[in-house]
Amino acid sequence: MKLSKDTTALLKNFATINSGIMLKSGQFIMTRAVNGTTYAEANISDVIDFDVAIYDLNGFLGILSLVNDDAEISQSEDGNIKIADARSTIFWPAADPSTVVAPNKPIPFPVASAVTEIKAEDLQQLLRVSRGLQIDTIAITVKEGKIVINGFNKVEDSALTRVKYSLTLGDYDGENTFNFIINMANMKMQPGNYKLLLWAKGKQGAAKFEGEHANYVVALEADSTHDF
């Protein structure tokens, strides 16, 4: 099999969520954070030929970048990963699947309680402003008929009362109120446009970012509130 630049870019992104990955035969990849706060999945154009666990995904991708784009990836007789181009061959150790935290199957997302969108340029601004202003927490809430993201520094403002950044996403025609809290450390998605689905029931809640190339599900923080 061969991995295109688009697939390797996705895998590099997934490595920011979990340093290891379990690749399974087919055209679907997925991962989740060790603490379970973030899940990501994607359909890819390449076909994965065999099941294999990779403990150090960034290390594997780094080695893969050193060979030609036409390098062939296969499974060696001893179960490890063989990377070969016209002149060189590299053997990368496969991991014991039990050492890699990975989802057993795709995680279904419930029917959304609220839906909006976040544009690529807005997501990029949010991430950049958050770094510049030390914003570690965002709250997705309703204000005057609009769905709004507010940014806070929870370390210095544990009650989240001092807004450091605000971004209006779109109109909200529902009657419910909510204040969904997300840790910025879990915002690992690739740059792009996303449909944002918000769900909550009781003390549980999650936000799903549906993109052109990948989907991400992020758990809401325990101090989130809603009346759904």
Curated annotation (Swiss-Prot):
KW Chloroplast (keyword) present = no
Q: Which residues form the signal peptide?
A: none
According to its UniProt entry, the protein's GO biological process terms are: bidirectional double-stranded viral DNA replication; DNA replication; viral DNA genome replication; viral transcription
Q: Which UniProt keywords apply?
A: DNA replication, Viral DNA replication, Viral transcription
Q: Which Gene3D superfamilies does the UniProt record give?
A: 3.70.10.10
What is the documented function of this protein? Sliding clamp that encircles the genomic DNA and links the DNA polymerase to the template to control the processivity of DNA synthesis. Responsible for tethering the catalytic subunit of DNA polymerase to DNA during high-speed replication. Interaction with the sliding-clamp-loader opens the sliding clamp so that it can be loaded around the DNA template. During transcription, encircles the DNA and tethers host RNA polymerase (RNAP) to it.
- Which family does this protein fall into? Belongs to the Tevenvirinae sliding clamp family.
Designated name of the protein: Sliding clamp
Organism field = Enterobacteria phage T4
